[in-house]
């Protein structure tokens, strides 16, 4: 007994040390605690919690640790305990709750009870702790306030506590919550019951019937939101935000009341900023999660907009603002930033059709207000709505731009800053149309604003706007301004370099350096004349800006030098290449001493990749220096944590952590520092593999070992995309090592790629992974997949196709929804486009398999056949039919004559669809008919005969050569050529040939153009009388066809066909008069094209 007491005493000391501010003491205590066996931990912790004479901090710590133990290690600890100990723990907990007098301590013990209850629901949903439920029912109707709070707290923490009995108890649960929410005497009971109601609704987010059953709790819930806010408690308001985010449909019966309450709270300046912003968050969240439902309440939306704008006016005077040299991060808790962000999100959520007419007048009035804060807010509001109101603003862009440019000359520097912001944002949101329409006005106005020497924040922001403008500016538009741009940028750079030396200020210089880089990047080789003006100063900055506070300037200058080098090309850059490489290498050797958040790192990594593009194979010599740090950055492992909600609340202010709510009181946290750098590093590895090819072979093994696991790096999409992109490129690099090494590498990546196709949650990333997998199969060829691979891949592709059809059905259901409107249709169209894009990637994978394996793969394909047949049914949308046909085209092209086995499924649709309304479908059908003639074997002969009149009808249709139809038409012309070439006895070639010649040349579809020119060469070389005409009278027409083909770049000089065409021309050249006659009938451009062909082929 004494020994146990002594141990318990030791444990109290340990709890004290776990709370110690001394890191060494605390670390040691954590290690000691970790080594205590689980059963002993439970005993010690319970004893400490029960001991009311122990220090309050120690008891609270013990409660937190016991909850964590049950949360993270229940299966290792609890089931191993003897059943009497388990029973004792359960009854002990309930007893302690009843005895506890301290409210905060009681909550912590309730958290333990809830955690235990969560783990005591078995797989069938049976609650293995009936006493816990009885305690809940007894306590909730107790006269003891503490016990009622305890019951509600447990239910809030674990609303699934009733397990499979929930339906049975539903009315009881409802009565319990209603009763507590009507408790007028005890505000804390009302608050807790409202939070518990929200938790219960959220825990049943897919149970629409339950929403209806609990709808009459909403008015009481909203009342609790209101009351708690005025008691300085925003917990119920936060619950309302969660409902708006996850189950907005629950709010539908009382949506107007919800919006009115949110508006009232948002506009009440007696509440603190956080509460007002949360109230606004309810409305903004609904605009994202239930836009169609919200759009019906236009008058309330119209009232919300002035509230957001009023928040944006909530700015403070700051005398040091204009010349601050450090860009402080926006104060994200400020009303101004919250209002701007809300406006941006709401415009995107509800759409410009609704928002722009409501906001336009408000903004115009603000811009005419004598108080600078209103003008600032009006301009920032214009910046914020550009993305959401894109379509509607485009129509009035001229008037907006003219108006905004006036404010670049506003008397107040912060208004000028906001005007720069608006110009920069519009340059991005409306590119490249914005640049095409307003280049003259905008460039002149920004250059003038950059001369504002007394206000460097304004100068820097004007330079930032110029960067946005030039990044998306077509090269041809920028060239006429180059002289003027360069003159301004150079004079400002010289001035700011002097200021850096004299005063140490750098803000404007950082932006100007990036502006120079952006101009060079767009101007490309046209920047050559200005190269020598900038390069010495830029090198000087990199050499001398070594102080810590100049790291960002140095990084941006390194970026600028490498972008200029890429723009002007190797020849011009070589004079400085070796100096620049030495500067980079010197920085690289200091790389290991750099702090993880050093801004130079990502600039360095990108600069190396540009140097690689400039130097090509010569870059290989630097790889030993570059690869170490690059691999180190690409291998960054982020800090992650699985926390319950209470632990997360303690961390939410912690720097750089982001949390995802996993439900059930669990949250996943990740520290985001280093993720962007990791993504950049991975993209650079892709760049090296692409540029250096076999020169990168030494690094392929370490890179593939890094990249393959990153296909599952769910913390950053860009990392997974780079990992996928790298796979086929690494195989290309490894080819030089021979087949054994290549096969080993492929085996290492193949399983992971297939699994990633099955599990990738993001459609954009998924499409990249599928594309890369298809490329890999093309590299590896026949035999690269074993039976297990085929089995798994077949299942995954089948699932993707089934999902495609299911998603289409779901979209049809959404079109029947009571809130359906044209904006909903737009978002459904976007979803549809995403699905179709994945379908194109399924087609890519099947294409690579058919082209590698030929007919051997057809038995495997049969599991997918019904789904592909379904794609080409007449009632399916045109993209389905297009891609279904493409898959059958591949089967005919690569698996014939065996493909005829499936002809019953596709021949009739293929013939029917060659005359389809959709040009994309016509093109796929025409291509199929062409390959049928080329590769299909004798069984396809009658169908070639049937196809000819259909193809001719499409070619001769009045609109056949319009932009949208021309590709389909050219595929029809090519198909006619293939039928004549490969199945000449199926059609009357003599009759068709003159027509076919009159349709040439093809110039849009380059691949089909090569096929038709090749057949034309066959006919000319065999002196076909119809082609040449009597006494060669058709030769001028043939010359014209060849010249047109050359002018439209449809003749590839490296292709054997180009040589054959050039030989035809040369033969005529030797026969004097005929040559003169042919050339005389050509335009000067056509004559030049013929000469070009002769010179190069």
From Swiss-Prot:
- At the top level, the lineage of the source is Eukaryota
Q: Which residues form the Importin N-terminal domain?
A: 28-99
| Transport is among the record's keywords | yes
Q: Which cysteines share a disulfide bond?
A: none
- One GO MF term: small GTPase binding
Q: Which family does it belong to?
A: Belongs to the importin beta family. Importin beta-3 subfamily.
Query: Which proteins does it associate with, and in what oligomeric form?
Result: Interacts with RPS7 and RPL5. Directly interacts with RPL23A (via BIB domain). Interacts with H2A, H2B, H3 and H4 histones. Interacts with CPEB3; this mediates CPEB3 nuclear import following neuronal stimulation which enhances the interaction in a RAN-regulated manner. Interacts with AIFM2; this interaction likely mediates the translocation of AIFM2 into the nucleus upon oxidative stress. Interacts with STX3 (isoform 3). Interacts with SRP19.
* Annotated function: Functions in nuclear protein import as nuclear transport receptor. Serves as receptor for nuclear localization signals (NLS) in cargo substrates. Is thought to mediate docking of the importin/substrate complex to the nuclear pore complex (NPC) through binding to nucleoporin and the complex is subsequently translocated through the pore by an energy requiring, Ran-dependent mechanism. At the nucleoplasmic side of the NPC, Ran binds to the importin, the importin/substrate complex dissociates and importin is re-exported from the nucleus to the cytoplasm where GTP hydrolysis releases Ran.
This chain's protein is named Importin-5
Q: From which source organism is this entry?
A: Mus musculus (Mouse)
Q: Which gene encodes it?
A: Ipo5
């Amino acid at each position: 007994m004494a020994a146990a007491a002594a141990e318990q005493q030791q444990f109290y000391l340990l709890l004290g040390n776990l709370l110690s501010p001394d890191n060494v003491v605390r670390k040691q205590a954590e290690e000691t605690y970790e080594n205590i066996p689980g059963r002993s931990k439970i005993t010690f912790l319970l004893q400490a919690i029960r001991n009311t004479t122990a220090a309050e901090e120690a008891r609270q710590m013990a409660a937190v640790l016991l909850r964590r133990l049950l949360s993270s290690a229940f299966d290792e600890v609890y089931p191993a305990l003897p059943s009497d100990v388990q029973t004792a723990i359960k009854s002990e907990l309930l007893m302690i709750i009843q005895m506890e007098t301290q409210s905060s301590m009681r909550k912590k013990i309730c958290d333990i009870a809830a955690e235990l209850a969560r783990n005591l629901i078995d797989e069938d949903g049976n609650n293995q702790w009936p006493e816990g439920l009885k305690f809940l029912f007894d306590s909730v109707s107790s006269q003891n306030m503490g016990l009622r709070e305890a019951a509600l707290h447990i239910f809030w923490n674990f609303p699934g506590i009733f397990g499979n009995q929930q339906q049975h108890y539903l009315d009881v649960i409802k009565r319990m919550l209603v009763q507590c929410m009507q408790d007028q005497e005890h505000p804390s009971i009302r608050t807790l019951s409202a939070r518990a109601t929200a938790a219960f609704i959220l825990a049943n987010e897919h149970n629409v019937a339950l929403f209806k059953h609990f709808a009459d709790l909403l008015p009481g819930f909203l009342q609790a939101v209101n009351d708690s806010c005025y008691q300085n408690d925003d917990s119920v308001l936060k619950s309302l935000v969660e409902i708006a985010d996850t189950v907005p449909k629950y709010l539908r019966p009382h949506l107007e009341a919800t919006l009115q309450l949110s508006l009232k709270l948002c506009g009440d300046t007696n509440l603190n900023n956080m509460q007002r912003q949360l109230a606004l968050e309810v409305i903004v969240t609904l605009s994202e999660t239930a836009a169609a439902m919200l759009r019906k309440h236009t008058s309330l939306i119209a009232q919300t907009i002035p509230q957001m704008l009023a928040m944006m006016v909530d700015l403070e005077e700051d005398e040091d603002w204009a010349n601050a040299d450090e860009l402080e991060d926006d104060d994200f808790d400020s009303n101004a930033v919250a209002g701007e962000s809300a406006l941006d999100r709401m415009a995107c959520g509800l759409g410009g059709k609704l928002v722009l007419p409501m906001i336009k007048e408000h903004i115009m009035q603000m811009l005419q207000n004598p108080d600078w804060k209103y003008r600032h807010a009006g301009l920032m509001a214009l910046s914020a709505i550009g993305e959401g109101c894109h379509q509607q603003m485009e129509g009035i862009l001229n008037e907006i731009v003219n108006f905004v440019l006036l404010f670049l000359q506003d008397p107040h520097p912060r208004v000028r800053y906001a005007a720069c912001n608006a110009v920069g944002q519009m340059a991005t949101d409306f590119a490249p149309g914005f640049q095409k329409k307003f280049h003259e006005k905008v460039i002149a106005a920004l250059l003038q604003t950059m001369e504002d020497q007394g206000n460097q924040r304004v100068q820097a922001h004007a330079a930032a706007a110029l960067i946005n403008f030039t990044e998306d500016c077509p090269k041809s538009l920028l060239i006429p301004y180059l002289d003027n741009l360069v003159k301004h940028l150079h004079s400002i750079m010289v001035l700011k370099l002097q200021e850096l030396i004299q005063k140490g200020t750098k803000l404007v210089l950082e932006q100007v350096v990036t502006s120079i880089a952006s101009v060079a990047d767009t101007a490309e080789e046209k920047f050559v004349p200005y190269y020598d003006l900038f390069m010495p100063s830029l090198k000087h900055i990199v050499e001398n800006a070594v102080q810590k506070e100049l790291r960002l300037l140095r990084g941006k200058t390194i970026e600028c030098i490498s972008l200029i080098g890429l723009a002007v090309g190797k020849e011009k850059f070589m004079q400085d290449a070796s100096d620049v490489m030495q500067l980079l290498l010197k920085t690289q050797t200091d790389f290991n001493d750099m702090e993880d958040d050093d801004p130079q790192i990502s600039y360095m990594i990108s600069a190396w990749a540009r140097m690689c593009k400039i130097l090509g194979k010569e870059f290989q010599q630097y790889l030993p220096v570059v690869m170490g740090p690059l691999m180190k950055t690409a291998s960054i492992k982020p800090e992650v944590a699985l926390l319950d909600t209470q632990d997360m609340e303690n961390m939410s202010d912690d720097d750089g952590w982001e949390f995802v709510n996993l439900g059930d009181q669990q949250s996943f946290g990740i520290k985001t520092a280093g993720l962007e750098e990791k993504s950049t590093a991975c993209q650079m590895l892709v760049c090296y593999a692409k540029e250096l090819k076999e020169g990168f072979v030494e690094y392929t093994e370490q890179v593939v070992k890094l990249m393959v696991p990153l296909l599952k790096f769910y913390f950053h999409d860009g990392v997974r995309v780079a990992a996928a992109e790298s796979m086929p490129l690494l195989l290309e690099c490894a080819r030089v090592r021979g087949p054994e090494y290549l096969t080993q590498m492929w085996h290492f990546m193949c399983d992971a790629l297939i699994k990633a196709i099955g599990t990738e949650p993001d459609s954009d990333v998924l499409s990249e992974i599928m594309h890369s997998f298809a490329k890999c199969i093309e590299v590896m060829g026949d035999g690269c997949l074993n039976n297990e691979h085929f089995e798994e891949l077949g299942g995954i592709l089948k699932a993707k196709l089934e999902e495609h059809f299911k998603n289409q059905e779901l979209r049809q259901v959404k079109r029947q929804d009571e809130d359906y409107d044209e904006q909903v249709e737009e978002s459904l169209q976007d979803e549809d486009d995403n699905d179709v894009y994945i379908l194109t990637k399924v087609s890519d994978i099947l294409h690579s398999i058919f082209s590698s394996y030929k007919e051997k793969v057809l038995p495997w394909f049969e599991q997918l056949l019904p789904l592909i047949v379904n794609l080409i049914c007449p009632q399916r949308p045109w993209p389905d039919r297009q891609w279904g046909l493409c898959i059958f085209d591949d089967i005919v092209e690569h698996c014939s004559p065996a493909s005829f086995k499936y002809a019953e499924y596709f021949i009739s649709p293929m013939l029917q669809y060659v005359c389809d309304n959709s040009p994309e479908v016509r093109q796929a059908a025409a291509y199929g008919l062409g390959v049928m003639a080329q590769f299909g074997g004798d069984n396809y002969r009658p169908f070639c005969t049937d196809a000819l009149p259909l193809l001719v009808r499409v070619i001769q249709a009045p609109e056949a050569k319009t932009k949208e139809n021309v590709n389909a038409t050219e595929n029809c012309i090519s198909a006619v050529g293939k039928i004549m070439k490969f199945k000449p006895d199926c059609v009357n070639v003599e009759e068709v040939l003159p027509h076919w010649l009159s349709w040439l040349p093809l110039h849009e579809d380059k691949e089909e153009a090569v096929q038709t020119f090749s057949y034309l060469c066959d006919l000319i070389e065999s002196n076909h009388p119809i082609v040449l005409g009597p006494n060669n009278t058709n030769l001028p027409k043939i010359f014209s066809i060849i010249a047109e083909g050359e002018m439209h770049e449809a003749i590839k000089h490296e292709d054997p066909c180009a040589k054959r065409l050039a030989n035809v021309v040369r033969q005529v050249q030797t026969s004097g008069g005929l040559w003169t006659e042919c050339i005389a009938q050509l335009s000067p451009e056509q004559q030049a094209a013929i000469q070009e062909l002769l010179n190069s082929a």
